[in-house]
């Protein structure tokens, strides 16, 4: 059975599953298009070019848009766990099954289908994102048997706090910005909730109790200590730490009270990208295990709708998937030989260049699904000098308070970090060993969000890390996404060359070819 699913609204995407195997999950923002792009015709054409047959099932995820005349719904709409709609339709002349289910269900089934099989009679699912904040109990037949609402819009509340302190965010008519949550997560590490004044605590509790964040009610907070205080102010950092703590406490309290102890927990929604919260869920002790997918936010919603359709028709959500299920790199031009020399990739020589402080644009195979660079569309740099962090933030045109993530081969985890668990998709925090000296990837609170690499999960990157370890003692590097500021991953040679020449990057590796900028060119 070939299922193709489409995700409307922001983070537009299309996913294809054939006989339970994920073929592609394509996000429209990737290939240097604006972050959070809606589904583009080019993305539809990309999937159509690569599929060998017309699908048996065409699935449309639900969505809702707030317009001046009211809410406009797409497909099954945004909220709810009601049964999907299945009809017969036609798709390019072929009779197909047409399927649509809510956006909320896409998150639930994305988590269920991507998680390892578990024979537990009950499973707990958490969806927390911009609009939905709830737990669900799922039975052994993969049916949702109970919904436990906790809080509407946890992600929107989290993002709103950043906008509240940001003088550039409007007092009226604004919506919580999709990219502010990650910035607030970075700022929270600079603050201590114990330092919160009564005024800050009052604001945070107001945010938690606010009826709605759409539109963002900033004008109602004009009298607060956080209104336009500046995102790097001490007040904002302390409030960020406190809100991070209070949001987790609110959901954890409900989990302990309402969910059976010992069930596996599957986390979905944009808040699943918060590594602090993921670590706390894993340490809570209430669940037998915790699973978070690399595309836990809306980048995985099309895939979730496809899995929901698969479950409806077969009774089983589980799929065979690989995180590198995007498109191959496009060789649409050749770097100018007057400016770039090309040589076969020499891992030892490249490791020496990295150790000397060079930043390397690193491209391998198909792009990663989800928002995080996992070693196929990455900027790499040595991790021992804090200058690497500053250089990478300058290259990426990011705020200097933003941390840089490490990538580490599994053989060196215990030497670099206090916790040596594997995390191939960079979803949990761990504590850095000070004696490891990896200053570029150590956040202000001593934590890091590390991608772990084995010889099978990403062989080419593991080989580079192993050669680097031979010379430097540890197989660890800085790893951040290869993209223009505000765009998705770079995925074609013309954009890669333009980016590297603009941002003064001297080294590009594409597959097994190393392009080196010629001095003075």
Swiss-Prot record:
It comes from the Bacteria. GO terms for molecular function: transferase activity. It is an enzyme of class 2 (transferase). GO terms for biological process: antibiotic biosynthetic process. Pathway: Antibiotic biosynthesis; cephamycin C biosynthesis. The keyword Disulfide bond does not apply. Gene3D superfamilies: 3.30.420.40, Carbamoyltransferase, C-terminal domain. Keywords: Antibiotic biosynthesis, Transferase. The keyword Lipid metabolism does not apply. Signal peptide: none annotated. InterPro entries: Carbam_trans_C, Carbam_trans_C_sf, Carbtransf_dom, NodU/CmcH_Carbamoyltrnsfr. Its EC number is 2.1.3.-. Belongs to the NodU/CmcH family. Catalyzes the carbamoylation reaction in the cephamycin biosynthesis. This is 3'-hydroxymethylcephem-O-carbamoyltransferase. It comes from Streptomyces clavuligerus. The gene is cmcH.
